[in-house]
Amino acid sequence: MTLDSATDAGIFARSFDDFVVEIGVASGRVVGVSFPDAVPDDAATDHALLDRVAAYLDGEEDHFDDVQVALTIPTAQRSVLEATRNVPYGETVSVERLARLAGLDPEDDDDRRTVETALRENPVPLFVPDHRVEGPGATPPTVARLLRAVESS
């Protein structure tokens, strides 16, 4: 999904049944996703991506793989998050499997730390679906469980 870089920038958030999703957009790319306790006063609630999130939470399959994200992270971590984007809807993988998908050695302590750090510091969870990895992630555990439940039904 290409966002209009001339007009699509800002903070957008919406409350869903069990949690709030906040997205930050700059230059037509998603630069941040968080799950605050409430919709911030300065956040707009109308955004096409939030509409897609609503449909997804209602059970409509959406891989979000067309959503352009800005990943300003080290190269090794970028490869991990790009591999995470390729984990199919409704599936989960181990940290070890994700390391292999990212071209890293899951037996190497440094490579394993790279994977775990990338997942914990993922700036755009949901669009880089760390909830599909059995291990650490930027998505809060309760939200991750809900997202996995949505994808398994």
Which positions does each model-derived feature cover?
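Basic nucleic-acid-binding alpha-helical/helix-turn surface characteristic of O6-alkylguanine DNA
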Residues: M1-D105
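Nucleic acid-binding interface residues in structured DNA/RNA-binding domains
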Residues: H63-S153
